[in-house]
Amino acid sequence: MSEMTPREIVSELDQHIIGQADAKRAVAIALRNRWRRMQLQEPLRHEVTPKNILMIGPTGVGKTEIARRLAKLANAPFIKVEATKFTEVGYVGKEVDSIIRDLTDSAMKLVRQQEIAKNRARAEDAAEERILDALLPPAKNQWGEVESHDSHSSTRQAFRKKLREGQLDDKEIEIDVSAGVSMGVEIMAPPGMEEMTNQLQSLFQNLGSDKTKKRKMKIKDGLKALIDDEAAKLINPEELKQKAIDAVEQNGIVFIDEIDKICKKGEYSGADVSREGVQRDLLPLVEGSTVSTKHGMVKTDHILFIASGAFQVARPSDLIPELQGRLPIRVELTALSAADFERILTEPHASLTEQYKALMATEGVNIAFTTDAVKKIAEAAFCVNEKTENIGARRLHTVMERLMDKISFSASDMNGQTVNIDAAYVADALGEVVENEDLSRFIL
């Protein structure tokens, strides 16, 4: 798991997300508390439970982006789900328990990658020997027994040197590699029977897992395939499962987006298949329960839950009281101003202006944005948000696409040219659409 300090986490998030200091601080503290808890001795460690977070803010201000960036920083099992995808137990649709199953699958993948990285040096040595065996098949004596490699020692060392220097990369050889194919059977699970179908799926996948087949490939590609093959052999599947389950139970993070969409409105009456019933199903997960997965039983007591929602129609108080109590840390994200839009266009690590410059550079076209142009684009996006629906920073994508439309279409015929985008260019491309409310409603 990540050992970054809260200050380092906030600094990393600042490279991608403008503003929202409170949300960044809350997430950074929660992530650091995961590490702090793991430093405690066992009796006390078990008693320290995570403080779940509820992020509240209008659409397009950075809630989902914080989740995306957090997933990369966490170095722990992480999953982001949409609350609207789930239905109450007994109805057609996904049940909330599948969140933990998916989180465990994510942990298996993460732990497998870590184990492969740990065993990579040994796997590379073994793969190298297999390549050399294919290049220099060991001699057999008169009884058909394979002799040791010593008789080929000097030749073998010469080939090893060439292999390491890349001189043999394009030579084709025939090697035995794992077939790496499953039976291709996909089983759809009826509600409540996911565990049985998971076991059947595993059974079919295991049927072809031990097979090997001869493949002809270049040494460069064959070496990669054999390294993966050898690394997989060095991993103990049972140990892998246990490590993955431990990682989920101790360090797992679940991000639930659009939680406001499962609030029951006061005036609403009728079946709430995907509303209050889902909240009640979420309760046991958030407060701690045991979920059965195909890898084993997983306890959710110490999994960190971060929920977010725009809460434009509903309010946080419309969540059922029990769920409100399980999300003790409330963070409000503020709406973005024109100045924020200006910073979003230039400051982040891969800002929109940098993306368009890089895309056009592939066609040999050099794009330059003036400071006035950036300010004008930000004002245009802010103005359209004010006049129509406020979709936050997402409006910048629409405005930029409209602005770059002519250049993007003609770029292949403009090789070697430089295009300076200034305030006049922006006004010409966006002026009419921004000023006419009817046009901006349908075009931007």
Swiss-Prot record:
Record bears the keyword Iron-sulfur: no
Alphabetical keyword list: ATP-binding, Chaperone, Cytoplasm, Nucleotide-binding
Q: Which residues bind ATP?
A: I18, G60, V61, G62, K63, T64, E65, D257, E322, R394
Molecular function per GO: ATP binding; ATP hydrolysis activity; peptidase activity; proteasome-activating activity
The record ties this protein, via Gene3D superfamilies, to: 1.10.8.60, DNA helicase RuvA subunit, C-terminal domain (1.10.8.10), P-loop containing nucleotide triphosphate hydrolases (3.40.50.300)
So where does this one cross the membrane?
A: none
Could you name the Gene Ontology cellular component terms for this entry? HslUV protease complex
What does the UniProt entry say about where the protein is found? Cytoplasm
Mind listing the GO biological process terms from this record? Answer: protein unfolding; proteolysis involved in protein catabolic process
Keyword check for Cytoplasm, yes or no.
Answer: yes
- One Pfam match: AAA
Main subcellular localisation: cytoplasm
Q: Where in this protein does the record put region Disordered?
A: 143-163
Q: Could you name the domain of life of the organism this protein comes from?
A: Bacteria
Q: Which family does it belong to?
A: Belongs to the ClpX chaperone family. HslU subfamily.
Describe, as the record does, how this protein assembles with itself and its partners.
Answer: A double ring-shaped homohexamer of HslV is capped on each side by a ring-shaped HslU homohexamer. The assembly of the HslU/HslV complex is dependent on binding of ATP.
Task: Report the protein's function.
Answer: ATPase subunit of a proteasome-like degradation complex; this subunit has chaperone activity. The binding of ATP and its subsequent hydrolysis by HslU are essential for unfolding of protein substrates subsequently hydrolyzed by HslV. HslU recognizes the N-terminal part of its protein substrates and unfolds these before they are guided to HslV for hydrolysis.
Which protein are we looking at? ATP-dependent protease ATPase subunit HslU
- Give the originating organism: Haemophilus influenzae (strain PittEE)
